[in-house]
Amino acid sequence: MASTAATAALSIIKSTGGAAVTRSSRASFGHIPSTSVSARRLGFSAVVDSRFSVHVASKVHSVRGKGARGVITMAKKSVGDLNSVDLKGKKVFVRADLNVPLDDNQNITDDTRIRAAIPTIKFLIENGAKVILSTHLGRPKGVTPKFSLAPLVPRLSELLGIEVVKADDCIGPEVETLVASLPEGGVLLLENVRFYKEEEKNEPDFAKKLASLADLYVNDAFGTAHRAHASTEGVTKFLKPSVAGFLLQKELDYLVGAVSNPKRPFAAIVGGSKVSSKIGVIESLLEKCDILLLGGGMIFTFYKAQGLSVGSSLVEEDKLELATTLLAKAKARGVSLLLPTDVVIADKFAPDANSKIVPASAIPDGWMGLDIGPDSVKTFNEALDTTQTVIWNGPMGVFEFEKFAKGTEAVANKLAELSKKGVTTIIGGGDSVAAVEKVGVAGVMSHISTGGGASLELLEGKVLPGVVALDEATPVTV
């Protein structure tokens, strides 16, 4: 058994006491206003939707009145910058992400992405635009009937309160005829854009054919913004203006704005199985955060890098030096880096495995760590209680197995508690989203990212082609 001092050393790695939590000179972002009538007109009712509707309303009011955007934003023009003069009678190509799951009977099992697209579409139709809606569904290889968008039409029509017309293709004479007959305030859903291989290849001729259907372009598909496809990047070369939809803008505001210029202290929670998959995120967040909490399978690489025994836990041997470098970088920057002090270990990787809680420094041979322990949860919670902004990406353990889900669930519940107290809580996509939904606290978080790979790449500081292609915004005072 390692000494108490050795165990304590795992808990907090920092330079000098208090340095991390006193960096408060950077500007914080503003208060979220109460839901307005104009926000409600955009079609929200649930808690999570009301938060989004407030955000949408702030985008509209920031341009039409004297209001300003609530957070520092990526400088891209938004659909909220447009009005009825810009939109009435105009054909607007809207790229949304309606890639929803369907069961064997083609029934939608989760309509979250459809509901997330409604504010932008509703804003456009209320301002007299003719909406030409484009999306992908699944990964079809050519025209594949089971990936047709037909099952989406009833739910879209219900949420919008109008009859959505569906085309049998996304380009060609028949589509052009439907576009020509589209009334102001009407919506035409094009068939799955990925039925054409030219979409993912971003072929200019295909992009030009898509663009020829419309007068201007709105990208509201954050989940595909990291891909340079014809409908996300190519069309912008032929359509002006090309602007961000409300959902895409909200993602940028939180994942770029709130993270780059947070209310402090700012904590980042990063989990997941491998250090290699989160290197970019960790390195980027070390430049911005005051507190960094690490969990998930990656922690065992950090433990081994410090000379600890990890039993048969997952370790990336080729990342031991990197782990040491990241620990040193955190210390040099005055970031409080917390590793779990205890872990839940198992004798096999299975939901029915035998398990027990041990200090992180005392994992026996033949056992593997599959979750953080209760002492770690307590330490993490105490650190999070000091924060004003928290971003979370990645589970604390194998939360698919109920026996090893407690750490992840504890983080989800803690963030829900903090959010209710006014702390900005950002769920950065992927498994963290599944975790807060499983626990039933998704509705109280400040922001839940709709992107998987796009969220990670944005947090890593990478350029997203679908965002870069959009028009620059007129400067707005923040």
Swiss-Prot record:
GO terms for cellular component: chloroplast; chloroplast stroma; membrane; mitochondrion; nucleus; plastid; thylakoid. Mg(2+) binds at residue 431. Residues 1-74 form a transit peptide. Its cofactor is Mg(2+). CDP binds at residues 272, 296, 394, 399. InterPro entries: Phosphoglycerate_kinase, Phosphoglycerate_kinase_CS, Phosphoglycerate_kinase_N, Phosphoglycerate_kinase_sf. Its EC number is 2.7.2.3. ADP binds at residues 272, 296, 399. Belongs to the phosphoglycerate kinase family. This is Phosphoglycerate kinase 2, chloroplastic.
